[in-house]
Design a protein with these regions (language model features):
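Membrane-interface "cap" regions at the ends of multi-pass membrane proteins
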Residues: 1-15, 74, 203-210, 226-231, ...
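Extracellular/periplasmic helix-exit of transmembrane alpha-helices
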Residues: 41-55, 198-206, 221-223, 241-271
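Juxtamembrane transmembrane-helix boundary signature
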Residues: 6-7, 34-67, 79-85, 89
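Hydrophobic alpha-helical segments and their helix-loop junctions in multi-pass secondary transporters
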Residues: 142-169, 183-200
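Hydrophobic transmembrane alpha-helices that form the core helical bundles
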Residues: 55, 74-107, 114, 118, ...
Length: 333
């Protein structure tokens, strides 16, 4: 397992958790079918990004720059600036979510944990190698399984859950359609495209024959290229399946607890974790908070966010696994 698993886990960021929690709290299981709808779409899109990197040895951002003419490049430049700004705001929100999650676990003040998380992330990105960062991501993806445990603990009517999962239910009203768009938007996020492509390139650089320029499949032996293609396809499939299982679990958990007790307005993932306590117990609430902290601290956008800003902008010139002296543009971004 590699980029696919990490990318899938990074999709379940605090904003995504809050959106799924709101979907479950406001409409119960009515939006659960979106987990089934988005699953093949995520697999297809992320596999395209992954295959592009494998076939060309080039990142998605660099390919876009090469593909478009001068006018297109200008538009792309504006979009990349907007991406960096959006990611900076997302980093701030994610770090605040770290504090909220740890505070719910009675681990200390939220502002202190936000500072600690920011410091650790910065240190790891500056000092650590990409191999160490990727290993931490893969190892700590398991913390997101907390949401699956919560869903199992609070759900009693699995027949109803399965029915809502496979049979779409659509309400033609403004709030439902707005939440539907929010769920689809937070599940299939554009930064995942860059993350998948760039993570694959970094992994290719770590290979013995990789070096500073990743070797595309066309320059490798047919047998090796075929094995790598099969492995990457499985990696993406497992990663996107894992991501949607977490989405499924969050919607089910909040539907079975908050919605059934007429709590329908959830503004943040931390609020959802706190609201679960009276109905699901302290253990389930703590697991939900643990999942929130994991979504921020480990395999989610709060760590990749600085990198995911850098990769589209500097993918042709730098990489996390390069020597520190060779990648000042990355650190600047």
């Amino acid at each position: 397992m590699g980029p696919g698993l990490v990318t899938g886990a990074s999709d379940d960021d605090p904003s995504g958790i809050a959106t799924y929690s709101q979907a479950g709290a406001q409409y119960g299981l009515s939006l659960l079918w979106t987990a089934l709808l988005t699953w093949p779409l995520m697999v297809a899109v992320q596999e395209i990004c992954d295959r592009t990197a494998l076939a060309t040895g080039t990142g998605l951002g660099e390919l876009a720059v090469k593909r478009f003419h001068r006018t297109g490049r200008a538009v792309l430049g504006v979009l990349l600036v907007a991406l960096v700004v959006a990611n900076a705001l997302n980093i701030a929100a994610d770090l605040l979510a770290v504090g909220s999650g740890m505070q719910l676990l009675d681990a200390g003040a939220s502002w202190l944990w936000a500072l600690i998380a920011g410091g650790l992330i910065t240190a790891l990105l500056v000092i650590g190698s990409f191999a160490r960062i990727a290993f931490a991501f893969k190892l700590l993806c398991a913390a997101l399984l907390a949401y699956l445990v919560v869903a199992v603990l609070v759900t009693h009517q699995w027949g109803s859950v399965l029915g809502h999962f496979v049979v779409p239910h659509v309400e033609l009203n403004k709030s439902y359609l707005q939440l539907l768009v929010a769920v689809l938007g937070t599940t299939i996020s554009p930064y995942l495209f860059f993350w998948q492509s760039a993570h694959r390139l970094e992994e290719m650089r770590e290979e013995p024959e990789g070096g500073s320029e990743p070797q595309p499949l066309g320059k490798q032996s047919p047998a090796r290229a075929q094995r790598k293609e099969r492995a990457s396809r499985l990696d993406v499939f497992v990663g996107m399946t894992f991501s949607n299982l977490v989405m499924f679990a969050i919607i089910v958990a909040t539907a079975e607890t908050l919605h059934s007790h007429h709590i329908t307005n959830i503004e943040s993932a931390a609020q959802a974790a706190k609201a679960l306590k009276p109905f699901a117990g302290h253990f389930a609430s703590a697991l939900f908070a643990l999942g929130l902290s994991a979504a921020v601290c480990w395999p989610s956008p709060s760590w990749p966010a600085p990198v995911r800003s850098e990769w589209p902008v500097c993918s042709a010139r730098s990489g996390v696994s390069r020597a520190r002296s060779a990648k000042p543009p990355s650190f600047t971004v």
